[in-house]
């Protein structure tokens, strides 16, 4: 950190806007394709509607003015937030109007959450299953009930008011989106002022956001949950404002409240340990993290981010400059290092987006793994359907974000990369030795693929030949994951040294006792064996292939030996023109297309592994005789052969969805069928030739002309790229909905 000389702080930061830059015109807005000179003329062929969808949000294609593009993106973000608030409001409204939330609060172990009641049209009311507490409805697995309880919501009226608040926020967001594009649009310099942005996002969004959540947890969530855990009727619990206004209620629950802020200012922070704890592990009553631990966590996080939000230099000549940090970042082997990256990150929003999507996607997958191993909300861990849904959801969201990172990194390379500004810096050096990177990564993929798959093929062969003693398994030739087991043991023992006052380790998965709530396993030590070792190497293989495809797309987006002038052809193109055979499907867009399939492969195996492992080794009932798991520990015996995965996971566990007709789960049976159809429909687009369809269309047009009913807009076959886009969309939609119905019918029936 440096104190700057006067000339270094000459450029004062100020809020700079243009007044009324774009008039509000519903006439223009209502005209399809108003953003493009070509499209606004209207359709000649059916390709027009496809181009309309492809380019509506591609602001780069509307204008080359970076300021105008930035304003459109900024305004669109407010629109996105508005839609999110409407969605959130809808969730809370359903909780208020159509749910058994108050009944669930009184007995969260035996009553299942439901917030959707189907109207009795054509017999659909069969879907309203008995979820307990005298309520008929669809069992939900979103985790909202557990989140609401953790927030201290005790009545449906509170959900109503929050839902209304969500709509008010949505209106504010839509207004802001309009205002900051049409009335007071920020200048480019405002968008490029990274130090102010960092300070505001770190201190404001993350710092004050965490602090206000910690305050809510301490003053509302903790007392409400303490009373709920003690068995107090939700209707008897004081309203949230009473905890704030009447200190006596708080003193009865947390004696240190009587001391006020004196311990804080005299640094006697230990006095507050009755509501800011460091217990570790799970609350044995609810099976969730101790809410006093999470309040402590958010308070600590808030302090860190509030400090971080004062680190960057703006008008006061103190703090870091982002450009100086990047320009100074040179290592012995990295040439010019990060020189030139500041320009990239302030002039290419695609580059920014690529980095943020990669980080955010990875974070989502990390969240998926923490939601089950350290379940943050009360009674979340014993709601197996919700646990499975949250793991699956956060994995898929993360996968899409990471593929999106590859897409926008490639768009940056094609549209925004300037070779003259990037000489011998890290980016240039990576691009110059891309052949070494990609060929090594390819070798890794081949190695992982053959070896991991080879272990399974060996096991299937030995099993087929009746030679179990020659298989890789926990009972024959063991391949124990010794490093993973060492990590588990270390994390289990570590708190004895690092946090001697903690009650237990961070997660019950490391070791120790079973945490049971209401006779169900919330969490317990997860033992790893040969079957886990095998499938983990399949995970490594599929993830590396996904990375190979995406990284090759980025590094070869501008040029390759096959097509040296690829940058001139753009982000997506079908082939390098006529007369150049073998150059189809090489665009950066096509790499994203292929990457999506491998992302789907990777995550399918990850969520299948999770689903089976948890049913086999964790989830189940607890009696005096011990733990009885849902599938009785069959993962270790069966998951070491491909046949075992097909027979004992896919086939055995799909019986619930296949046999769901005539029951409350029958919608999942219909969805399972329909999603298979959507998936199969995708193959028609993926295995098609464009010329075949054009020929067919022309003979159909001939027939229409004969009957004098030919359309004025000429039908055309989908382009190669459009066909692949439609194909991958239906492939993923069909695959995801198939998995969704398979998982939920199974876990709701047995969990």
UniProtKB/Swiss-Prot annotation:
Membrane spanning residue stretches: 73-96, 159-182, 198-222, 294-312, 349-372, 388-414, 436-458, 533-551, 591-612, 665-687, 725-745
UniProt-annotated binding residues for chlorophyll a: 684, 692
Superkingdom of source: Eukaryota
Binding positions for [4Fe-4S] cluster per the UniProt entry: 575, 584
Example of a GO biological process term: photosynthesis
Catalytic activities: reduced [plastocyanin] + hnu + oxidized [2Fe-2S]-[ferredoxin] = oxidized [plastocyanin] + reduced [2Fe-2S]-[ferredoxin]
Positions of chlorophyll a' binding: 676
Pfam families: PsaA_PsaB (PF00223)
Keyword Transcription: no
EC class name: oxidoreductase
Membrane-topology annotation of the record: Multi-pass membrane protein
Disulfide bonds: none
Family: Belongs to the PsaA/PsaB family.
Function, in words: PsaA and PsaB bind P700, the primary electron donor of photosystem I (PSI), as well as the electron acceptors A0, A1 and FX. PSI is a plastocyanin/cytochrome c6-ferredoxin oxidoreductase, converting photonic excitation into a charge separation, which transfers an electron from the donor P700 chlorophyll pair to the spectroscopically characterized acceptors A0, A1, FX, FA and FB in turn. Oxidized P700 is reduced on the lumenal side of the thylakoid membrane by plastocyanin or cytochrome c6.
Protein name in the entry: Photosystem I P700 chlorophyll a apoprotein A1
Organism in which the protein naturally occurs: Tetradesmus obliquus (Green alga)
